[in-house]
């Protein structure tokens, strides 16, 4: 992994203003009127990742979320799902094997959050094991999607912890120089 130049300050500001506060307010309204809160949309996680990693959205319709990173989010201790659609799944899987992966784990109405970065070289064997399964899946009639997951334990063991938030407070952030 190259030297890190991450933007913790702006990412944490984004988290407070656009993820945590609005989410908690919306969650209360959803509950009050008997709805299940759907959570934070993927595009918000991708924007959060782009700010943190000083990256940009991938302009292509297929492939990784950002130019240099794939972004995943899941509840604390949950696996991270990867989903591949029939017509672009192979291209997406191949593209994701060429970028590092940013994993956000969250809990307690997003009050707690960890961000970890996993070098793509550690994920390539997993992606290679999925490739024949993905191809077989699409040979079956009616199959439009292929889903697999990277376990939380793998991410914790192999990922570099970039930041950690507890009860809405930033309690850990890796040095901006990557140390």
Region annotations inferred by a language model:
Residues 1-68, 73-179:
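Nucleic-acid endonuclease domains
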């Amino acid at each position: 992994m190259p030297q890190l130049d991450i933007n913790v300050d702006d990412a944490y500001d984004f988290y407070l203003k656009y993820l945590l506060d609005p989410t908690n307010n919306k969650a209360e309204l959803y509950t009050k009127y008997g709805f299940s809160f759907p959570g934070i949309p993927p595009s918000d996680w991708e924007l959060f990742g782009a700010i943190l990693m000083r990256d940009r959205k991938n302009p292509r319709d297929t492939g990784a979320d950002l130019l240099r990173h794939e972004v995943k989010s899941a509840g604390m201790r949950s696996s991270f799902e990867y989903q591949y659609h029939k017509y672009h799944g192979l291209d997406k899987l191949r593209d994701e094997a060429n970028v590092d992966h940013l994993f956000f784990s969250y809990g307690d109405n997003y009050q707690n959050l960890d961000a970890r970065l996993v070098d793509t070289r550690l994920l390539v064997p997993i992606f290679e094991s999925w490739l024949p399964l993905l191809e077989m899946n699409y040979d079956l009639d009616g199959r439009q999607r292929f889903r697999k997951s990277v376990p939380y334990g793998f991410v914790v063991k192999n990922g570099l912890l970039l930041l950690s938030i507890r009860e809405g407070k930033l309690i850990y952030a890796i040095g901006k120089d990557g140390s």
